[in-house]
């Protein structure tokens, strides 16, 4: 079996399910290993339903958050390649990274709605099939 962060989280959740895995001091959000594993499994399953296959690139336009970690791990669990996008970049820069990396799916947070709407409006220039 290939070892990746998804496999490691699954093992840790089995060993210490109630131990805290994530703490956000700015919002007091806390997740146990069981919760983080379950949430990343949900994302992995959603990506599989979209037809994402091992080796395909999935871009993340998310702030530093539990959602970023859950998505990152979910992508790893199915063998996808994470393409993290810097929140400081503008649409032209993001378009270049998305196209250059071969990204076919983009997961984004509401903070990125305006820039993603701009990118989506550019159509096939980005080759993203799932927004």
Annotate each PLM feature.
Residues 2, 61, 106-109:
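Active-site-adjacent beta-strand anchor residues
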Residues 1-22:
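A short N-terminal helical cap/helix-turn-helix that marks the beginning
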Residues 1, 35, 83-85:
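Short, flexible loop segments at the rims of nucleotide/cofactor-binding pockets, characterized by
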Residues 49-50, 77-131:
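Structural core segment of the AMP-binding/adenylate-forming
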Residues 9, 71, 116:
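Aromatic/hydrophobic pocket-lining residues that form π-stacking "cages" and hydrophobic walls in ligand
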Residues 1, 16-18, 54, 99-102, ...:
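Residue-level preference for short coil/turn positions at secondary-structure junctions
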Residues 18-65, 69-73, 90-95:
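Conserved AMP-binding/adenylate-forming core of the ANL superfamily
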């Amino acid at each position: 079996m290939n070892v990746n962060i998804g496999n490691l989280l699954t093992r840790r959740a089995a060993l210490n399910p109630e131990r805290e895995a994530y703490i956000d001091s700015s919002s007091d959000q806390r997740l146990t290993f069981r919760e983080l594993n379950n949430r990343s499994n949900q994302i992995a399953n959603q990506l599989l339903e979209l037809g994402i296959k091992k080796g395909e690139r999935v871009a993340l336009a998310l702030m530093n958050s539990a959602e970023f970690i859950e998505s990152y791990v979910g992508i790893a669990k199915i063998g996808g390649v994470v393409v993290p996008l810097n929140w400081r970049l503008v649409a032209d820069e993001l378009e270049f990274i998305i196209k250059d990396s071969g990204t076919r799916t983009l997961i984004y947070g509401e903070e990125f709605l305006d820039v993603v709407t701009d990118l989506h409006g550019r159509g096939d220039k980005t080759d993203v099939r799932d927004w």
